[in-house]
Structure formats: C-alpha cells, structure tokens
Amino acid sequence: MLTRRQAFIALTAGMAACGEPSGADAPPAGSLGWALGGPWRMAPERDQWRHPLQTLLFWGLQGEMTVLEILPGLGWYTSILAPYLAANGGRLIAAGFDPRGGTMAQREVLAAWEARFTHEPELYGSIQRTVVSAQGGALAPPGSVDLAILANNVHTLMADGIAERVFGEVLAALKPSGALGVEQHRAASTGLQDPLAGAGYVQEAYVKALAQEAGFEFVAASDVNANPRDTRDHPFGVWTLPPTLRTSALGQPDDPSFDTAPFEAIGESDRMTLKFRKPSGPARTPAATPNSSP
C-alpha cells in the first residue's frame, strides 16, 4: 500500500503525464511529478516501457536522499533524479565510465552525459562524479548513500568482468538498511547464464545471487517493467529492440534492408525490477552464484 506521501507523488506525477498542466493543476515545483513532467526530460516517450514513477516509488526514492546512480549512460534516469534531488536538498552521485580507460563508445557516452548535466547547476544541482573502473575503488564515501540504482547495466558490468566487485562496492557505499534498486533486461530462467551477458539479458536468479553474494538482503520484486511479448531471441541481442533498433552486428554498417517492424511491435525489453537492502547488522554468509556457461 502506498503511503500518503507516495500517493501524493503519484497524483502529481500523473497530472504531469497528462499534457501541459497550468495554474492549480501543475505539479508543485520540486515534486517528483514536476521532475517527471519537466521539459528537460530525456526521451519521456519511453515512460510507457520503463514506468519511472512506479519504479522509483518501489525502490523507495525520497527527495532528501543521497542517491548513487551506477553507470548512468546518457542520463535517462539522471534527468529525473538530478532536478528532483537538487530541489529537495538531496544529493546525486553518478559513478560513470572511467575517462582514462574503457572503450571509445564508453568515453563518448561519458562525454555526452557530462555535456548535458554539468552546465546547469541551477537545475541539476552539483552532481558528484565518481568512476567505475577496472582497478576498483570507492563509488561513494563508505556508508553515505541511502539508495543506489543499477538501471539496465548489470550486463555491462558482467561484460567487463567486474559485476561481483561492483556489487560489493555498492554495498560499502550504502548506509545500513540502505537500498539497491535494479532494473535489468531479463533472460529466460532456464539454461545457463552467459557470464558476459553478450545478448544483454541476465537471469533474475543470477542478479539476485550477485547481490546476495555481495552481502545484500533481497527485499522484493516487481513486474512493473515486464513485457511478455519479448521472446529474447533477437538477431542482435536486446539492442534489436527499441530504442536502439540495431540492424546489423556491432561494428558493422547499418543494414537498410533489415525489417525493424516486428521488433518495434514487441516494444522495449522484458525487465526485472528488484529491490535489495544492506543489512543493518552483521553481514550474512554469501550465497553462491548460479551456474553460468564457461
């Protein structure tokens, strides 16, 4: 059941989604509805697939929190989180790609994020930036974070071979009882998990085991971002689907003859939405990670 505060946020966000409210109908400045309805939003048309209001409420977001966003990409969630937290006395820490390492594509993503979010402090606040690097390191001061968010990037950590370590670094950054919210393209529950997640999909049990092995407690799962039309069997992995609509293998020229219509009809991927918590007491014995293919 929603709290009174969550119900109010949901109401104001719903008004924001109904068009251009004016006067008394406009969401209050600084509310989550205001942040969701702002003209600064990145690709708000994706809300029908990613359900940011329901997802953020499920994870427990509040305006005064310190939030750690791991690998924010181009900033789809940053464009919601940064204004909302800045308006309410909260703080956003963005742990992005290492500008001194990684791939050219990762550096280009980082540069695009920086160009968008580092020049308007009156809107986005002063976002603290840290690095997710191959060498490891603190993502935030130990025990300083209320909520950490991993949105559609567990597969990236797996591809780089650093998923287990980063989950541990997130745990260290969180306050006792702090939460970790995960959104991730969901693989079929049968078969072996590709340890590099080459198609972008990860089994839900595998993500849970990664978190529990790091010391997290599982809290709850939501199907708010589920898409039963996603068969997961696409020629270019999850990137065959919107919003990417890839038409050729990575590194190859686009294929203008490739028919994207069937994949547009599917919509964005089927996704798990999970919530974990850092224990408030002594850490539990880690769980074993499920089998993966060699």
How does the language model describe each region?
Residues 177-184:
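Conserved beta-strand signature within the Rossmann-like core of class I S-adenosyl-L-methionine
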Residues 64-73:
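Conserved class I S-adenosyl-L-methionine
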Residues 86, 158, 174-175:
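Helix-to-beta-strand junctions that scaffold the AdoMet/dcAdoMet cofactor pocket
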Residues 139-148:
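A short acidic, Gly/Pro-enriched loop at the edge of an enzyme's catalytic core
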Residues 1-14:
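N-terminal secretory signal peptides and thylakoid transit peptides that target proteins
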Residues 164-176:
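A short glycine-rich, Lys/Arg-flanked "PGG" loop and its adjoining helix->strand segment in the class I
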Residues 260-294:
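C-terminal lobe and adjacent flexible extensions of AdoMet/dcAdoMet transferase-like proteins
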Residues 32-56:
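Class I SAM-dependent methyltransferase Rossmann-like catalytic core
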